[in-house]
Amino acid sequence: MNSAHYDAVVVGSGFGGSLVARALVRAGFKTALLERGQWARRDDVDWDQSEILIKQRYRGTSPLLIKQYGSRDFQRVYANEVVGGNSVFYGGASLRLRPADFARWPFAYGDLAPYYTQAEQLMGVHGEAGADPHEPPGVGAYPHDAIELSAPARRIYETGQALGLQPFKIPLAINFSDATRPLCLRCITCDGFPCKVEA
């Protein structure tokens, strides 16, 4: 039996677990990160909608019981189980919660605002501060400029503007500019799929 000793053990390698483990290691703590999922395969099958969305290739075996506000009943939800947790599947959208979202929480948006900024820097978010008409206060410059819209997205954007709406480019934590890492291919399988190139 392995008798290794650690200063800290973090359970789960999703957003929360990986960031906590990173902070502990950077502070000099010997840290073990436990994950029940396997590595995402990142093969051609990971771009197959049937495999990922219908057959649920990475579906976990332990249900989470979720009760939505105002509902009487709990729902069973099965999270994807892979190294990286749902950070592997979320599509890069990096919006901040709004101050009103914290009304029932034991802390306020302002308490978390500096940590949002740290996370945006760490993840290399592309975005344009001030573009979101409902943006919470204190959003500074993103590490990278917002990405150019694809032709279909540009058409939707311009149509929204013509209708008097205020469309904006969603801040994205996807690599479009750091040539030392794989760059986004601009495929159509971001949200809900593991990125095949890990952009």
Name what the model sees in each region.
Residues 1-110, 114-117:
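N-terminal glycine-rich phosphate/pyrophosphate-binding loop and immediately adjacent elements
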Residues 107-199:
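Conserved redox-cofactor binding core of oxidoreductases
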